[in-house]
Amino acid sequence: MNELPLHLLNMRSLTRDHIEKLIQRANYFLTQGMEKNSVFETLKGHVVANLFFEPSTRTRNSFEIAAKRLGAMVLNPNLKISAISKGETLFDTIKTLEAMGVYFFIVRHSENETPEQIAKQLSSGVVINAGDGNHQHPSQALIDLMTIKQHKPHWNKLCVTIIGDIRHSRVANSLMDGLVTMGVPEIRLVGPSSLLPDKVGNDSIKKFTELKPSLLNSDVIVTLRLQKERHDNSVDIDAFRGSFRLTPEKLYSAKPDAIVMHPGPVNREVEINSDVADNQQSVILQQVRNGVAMRMAVLELFLLRDFRFF
């Protein structure tokens, strides 16, 4: 197994073995921890700082619950009234928090590669990228891979269709990287051409501009919201809704046992119909539940740095 990176900044830094072990450990935390309301002491005495420079409900709260279930102290600085608002640089703030004893820095930022820049400033702490611009969101990809494997355990037989604003989605970037690492043979990207990436970088990834053909024989369908905060208002939402909203009728084109996923937040009746979001094929809430368990596994691994402790 290749050496674990010092920080979790992107999915390409993880090997298939790393991902499989993290899924295995997260499933343990799901069944032996969350379902039994257990609290572990792996992170006892350690401080975790949630540094979210963009709004978040699922990711921030999920990391906080994960850290507390591992016994950590959690710091949620109000960044609007921090020294940053008085002119202190972000990197001086990071060094100050490290001097106070913060070990884990969970970072979400609107600018690409900010977590990487923060990691370069640390003496001994760990940075977990909780989403940077339209670049990467590795913990969400790990959650999605965990959820997929719970329903579809054979990576080499899967067809995964990702629908929506892929060009601006850090979730899509990380998930594509993870699916390629796991050996998924067919990954389909679907949306208007303006919302698809110019290059895909792997032969297993194909682009579609029509929804129904992209759903044929799909095992996994991932819907994504429009990232309106990352581009201008040139996207015609009504046109997008008419062509790319996942409805029960369109879902019939996929395999009967296909699962439907969404990383959230969900914009109902834009990228996904409520009847699909709430039906038996939807695993959206399972993704949320898996989020705490996977983030527990991530925090534990990047502290212990040894799979033998798993």
Swiss-Prot record:
SUPFAM superfamilies: Aspartate/ornithine carbamoyltransferase. Pfam families: OTCace (PF00185), OTCace_N (PF02729). L-aspartate binds at residues 86, 170, 225. Keywords: Pyrimidine biosynthesis, Transferase. Signal peptide: none annotated. GO terms for molecular function: amino acid binding; aspartate carbamoyltransferase activity. Pathway: Pyrimidine metabolism; UMP biosynthesis via de novo pathway; (S)-dihydroorotate from bicarbonate: step 2/3. Its EC number is 2.1.3.2. It is an enzyme of class 2 (transferase). GO terms for biological process: 'de novo' pyrimidine nucleobase biosynthetic process; 'de novo' UMP biosynthetic process; amino acid metabolic process. It catalyses: carbamoyl phosphate + L-aspartate = N-carbamoyl-L-aspartate + phosphate + H(+). GO terms for cellular component: cytosol. The keyword Transferase applies. Carbamoyl phosphate binds at residues 58-59, 108, 137, 140, 264-265. Catalyzes the condensation of carbamoyl phosphate and aspartate to form carbamoyl aspartate and inorganic phosphate, the committed step in the de novo pyrimidine nucleotide biosynthesis pathway. Heterododecamer (2C3:3R2) of six catalytic PyrB chains organized as two trimers (C3), and six regulatory PyrI chains organized as three dimers (R2). Belongs to the aspartate/ornithine carbamoyltransferase superfamily. ATCase family. This is Aspartate carbamoyltransferase catalytic subunit. It comes from Coxiella burnetii (strain Dugway 5J108-111). The lineage of its organism: Bacteria, Pseudomonadati, Pseudomonadota, Gammaproteobacteria, Legionellales.
